[in-house]
Swiss-Prot record:
UniProt protein name: Protein E7
MF annotations from Gene Ontology: DNA binding; DNA-binding transcription factor activity; protein domain specific binding; zinc ion binding
Keywords assigned: Activator, DNA-binding, Early protein, G1/S host cell cycle checkpoint dysregulation by virus, Host cytoplasm, Host nucleus, Host-virus interaction, Inhibition of host innate immune response by virus, Inhibition of host interferon signaling pathway by virus, Interferon antiviral system evasion, Metal-binding, Modulation of host cell cycle by virus, Oncogene, Transcription, Transcription regulation, Viral immunoevasion, Zinc, Zinc-finger
Gene that encodes it: E7
Cellular localization per UniProt: Host cytoplasm; Host nucleus
GO biological process entries: DNA-templated transcription; symbiont-mediated perturbation of host cell cycle G1/S transition checkpoint; symbiont-mediated suppression of host innate immune response; symbiont-mediated suppression of host type I interferon-mediated signaling pathway
Chain span(s) of sequence motif Nuclear export signal: 83-91
Subunit structure of this chain's protein: Homodimer. Homooligomer. Interacts with host RB1; this interaction induces dissociation of RB1-E2F1 complex thereby disrupting RB1 activity. Interacts with host EP300; this interaction represses EP300 transcriptional activity. Interacts with protein E2; this interaction inhibits E7 oncogenic activity. Interacts with host TMEM173/STING; this interaction impairs the ability of TMEM173/STING to sense cytosolic DNA and promote the production of type I interferon (IFN-alpha and IFN-beta).
Family: Belongs to the papillomaviridae E7 protein family.
Gene3D superfamilies, sorted: 3.30.160.330
Gene Ontology CC: one annotated term: host cell nucleus
PTM section of the record: Highly phosphorylated.
Zinc fingers (unnamed), renumbered ranges: 65-101
Length: 105
């Protein structure tokens, strides 16, 4: 470059073909049924794990202590259906006691 701004004449483009690359692979793979089965099992596990992660979510439930009315926090991992069962139990006769009241008996 001889000036402040490059000109098209100063830019030299040389396009030369690269040497040809041999795309043939001379490697041989051992066909192992165990590896194939492991790969299939791994592929089947992933969707199942994803489904379990979707089904079992973490829920925080705040329930008053049955003796002192202090709020107790319950961390529950369950499906929505199981959470409904817990909700029905808490709305019924099931009561929760805070650690202070439980230790004082």
């Amino acid at each position: 470059m001889h000036g402040k701004v490059p000109t098209l004449q100063e830019v030299i483009l040389e396009l030369a073909p690269q040497t040809e690359i041999d795309l043939q692979c001379n490697e041989q793979l051992d066909s192992s049924e165990d590896e194939d089965e492991d790969e299939i099992d791994h592929l089947l596990e992933r969707p199942q794990q994803a489904r379990q992660a979707e089904q079992h979510k973490c829920y925080l439930i705040h329930v008053p202590c049955c003796k002192c009315e202090l709020v107790v926090q319950l961390d529950i991992q369950s499906t929505k259906e199981e959470l409904r069962v817990v909700q029905q139990l808490l709305m019924g006769a099931l009561t929760v006691t805070c650690p202070l009241c439980a230790s004082s008996k």
